[in-house]
C-alpha cells in the first residue's frame, strides 16, 4: 500500500510540474493562471500525501523513490510535447528504473 501511495504522490507532483510547463507555453493570460492554479493544487496534494508516506515508509527508501518523477516527466514530455529522448537520457532513465527495483527489493 505504501508503494502505491509513493507512486500516486509522484504522479501528483509530476502533474503539477507538467502544468507549470504548459503554463510556460500558454500565451493567453487567463490560461496561464488556470494552469498555475492547477499546478498548485496538484503539488499541494502531492505534499500532503508525501507527509503521510513519510510516516509509514523509512526515509532511506521513500526519498530515492522520488526518482520516479524523472521517469514520468520524461515519458510525459515525449508523448505530450513530442520532445526527443536522447540515447544518454534513455540510458539514465533505465538506470533509475534499476535503482528503484534494487531499493524496492531491499525494503
From Swiss-Prot:
Keywords from the named record: Cell inner membrane, Cell membrane, Lipid A biosynthesis, Lipid biosynthesis, Lipid metabolism, Lipopolysaccharide biosynthesis, Membrane, Transmembrane, Transmembrane helix, Transport
Location of the EamA domain: 31-105
Pfam families reported in the protein's UniProt record: EamA (PF00892)
Subcellular location: Cell inner membrane
Gene3D superfamilies registered for this protein in UniProt: 1.10.3730.20
Keyword check for Ribosomal protein: no
Subunit-level organization: Heterodimer of ArnE and ArnF.
Name under which the protein is recorded: Probable 4-amino-4-deoxy-L-arabinose-phosphoundecaprenol flippase subunit ArnE
Amino acid at each position: 500500500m505504501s508503494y502505491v501511495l509513493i507512486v500516486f504522490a509522484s504522479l501528483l507532483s509530476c502533474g503539477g510540474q507538467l502544468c507549470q510547463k504548459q503554463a510556460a507555453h500558454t500565451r493567453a493570460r487567463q490560461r496561464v493562471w488556470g494552469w498555475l492554479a492547477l499546478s498548485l493544487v496538484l503539488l499541494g496534494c502531492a505534499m500532503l500525501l508525501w507527509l503521510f508516506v513519510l510516516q509509514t515508509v523509512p526515509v532511506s527508501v521513500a526519498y530515492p523513490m522520488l526518482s520516479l518523477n524523472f521517469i514520468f516527466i520524461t515519458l510525459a514530455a515525449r508523448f505530450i510535447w513530442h520532445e526527443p529522448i536522447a540515447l544518454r537520457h534513455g540510458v539514465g532513465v533505465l538506470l533509475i528504473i534499476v535503482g528503484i527495483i534494487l531499493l524496492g527489493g531491499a525494503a
